[in-house]
Amino acid sequence: MCEVFRRLPGTAPGSSPPAPATHRLRLLGRELRVRRFMIFCRFWAKMATNDAVLKRLEQKGAEADQIIEYLKQQVALLKEKAVLQATLREEKKLRVENAKLKKEIEELKQELIQAEIQNGVKQIPVPVQSDTPVQASSAVSTSVIQSTSVSTISCSIKEHSKGGGEEKKVKEKTDKKGEKKEKKLQSAAPSADSKPVDVSRLDLRIGRIVTVKKHPDADSLYVEEVDVGEAAPRTVISGLVNHVPLDQMQNRMVVLLCNLKPAKMRGILSQAMVMCASSPEKVEILAPPNGSVPGDRITFDAFPGEPDKELNPKKKIWEQIQPDLHTNAECVATYKGSPFEVKGKGVCRAQTMANSGIK
């Protein structure tokens, strides 16, 4: 029986077919070579792609390092700028404080000089120090000061050793000198206190309460804005909560003392005082005459004169005048019997309180 077979590649025509085992080995070897070649190609392709990725990563890392370094520099600059600004602010603050302290020192020095002059102490002018002092000159000046201080101390010891009689003479001479200097100062000083201490020193005016409310930090005080004929109303603090209802304060015409030194009352500056008839049991606001307008001046026929611009609290002028302010038997406000008068319009009075004090 004839055996028919397919001719394999690589067999010559008419040749006999190869043995089956040899043929399989050849096929396997050829397939292995093909697979090795494919694996080798894939490996080199992967290596090429990995190199590109690594290069990109290295480039990104370098860029990130540069950005981080730049940010560090910016943070350092910002810190330096903040420290510089804080230093400048502190320096400015210290300069202002130093200027205030210098001013206070100069004021205290002037007060001390005036007190020494009044007590008869002889004043010796102090040499002004130059802007560019030399160490040698400063040393000489200190030595001179030390020598003068030593000499003055020795002289004082000698004077004390001479006895009490000479001390008495020296004291009498200094007292006489002090009296002469005081007389000169009194004659040279402006005659501000030559005015009599009476009601003419008070700036009493008519005012109208524009707004009123309770003090935020005090239950017994009102805070009022009062028109006294000036460009802007004045803020006035009054202790009238327990005596006058709030609705009766609004738009009310009042008498104001306008030249007291402004003072803070529970944190709010009061620029005037509402005048009231007052007793331990009762308080009534003084009523101006009909037809009065804000800014009208209150005068006293028996006490003419112009009021002080501002009463000096050290002189106690208000404290000396106030005890003579009273309402008379007809409830008219008076000073030593002379009524509170608005020229051409009438007198000021309390509603019901007769023969009571005014403050």
Swiss-Prot record:
Glycyl lysine isopeptide (Lys-Gly) (interchain with G-Cter in SUMO1) crosslink location in chain: K184
Residues in tRNA-binding domain copies: 198-299
Keyword Phosphoprotein appears in the UniProt entry: yes
Biological processes per GO annotation: angiogenesis; apoptotic process; inflammatory response; positive regulation of glucagon secretion; translation
Segments of this protein annotated with the region Disordered: 156-196
Region span, Required for endothelial cell death: 149-163
Bilayer-crossing regions: none
Modified residues (Phosphoserine): S187
Pfam families assigned: tRNA_bind
Region annotated Interaction with HSP90B1, chain positions: 100-241
SUPFAM superfamilies: Nucleic acid-binding proteins
Statement: the UniProt record of this protein carries the keyword Cell division: no
Modification after translation (UniProt): Cleaved by caspase-7 in response to apoptosis to produce EMAP-II.
Region feature Required for endothelial cell migration, mapped onto this chain: 163-239
GO molecular function: cytokine activity; tRNA binding
GO CC term, one of those recorded: cytosol
Residues recorded with modification N6-succinyllysine: K316
Subunit structure: Homodimer. Part of the multisynthetase complex (MSC), a multisubunit complex that groups tRNA ligases for Arg (RARS1), Asp (DARS1), Gln (QARS1), Ile (IARS1), Leu (LARS1), Lys (KARS1), Met (MARS1) the bifunctional ligase for Glu and Pro (EPRS1) and the auxiliary subunits AIMP1/p43, AIMP2/p38 and EEF1E1/p18. Interacts (via N-terminus) with RARS1 (via N-terminus). Part of a complex composed of RARS1, QARS1 and AIMP1. Interacts (via C-terminus) with SMURF2. Interacts (via N-terminus) with HSP90B1/gp96 (via C-terminus). Interacts with PSMA7. Interacts with TARS3.
Function: Non-catalytic component of the multisynthase complex. Stimulates the catalytic activity of cytoplasmic arginyl-tRNA synthase. Binds tRNA. Possesses inflammatory cytokine activity. Negatively regulates TGF-beta signaling through stabilization of SMURF2 by binding to SMURF2 and inhibiting its SMAD7-mediated degradation. Involved in glucose homeostasis through induction of glucagon secretion at low glucose levels. Promotes dermal fibroblast proliferation and wound repair. Regulates KDELR1-mediated retention of HSP90B1/gp96 in the endoplasmic reticulum.
Name of the protein in question: Aminoacyl tRNA synthase complex-interacting multifunctional protein 1
Species: Cricetulus griseus (Chinese hamster)
Primary gene name: AIMP1
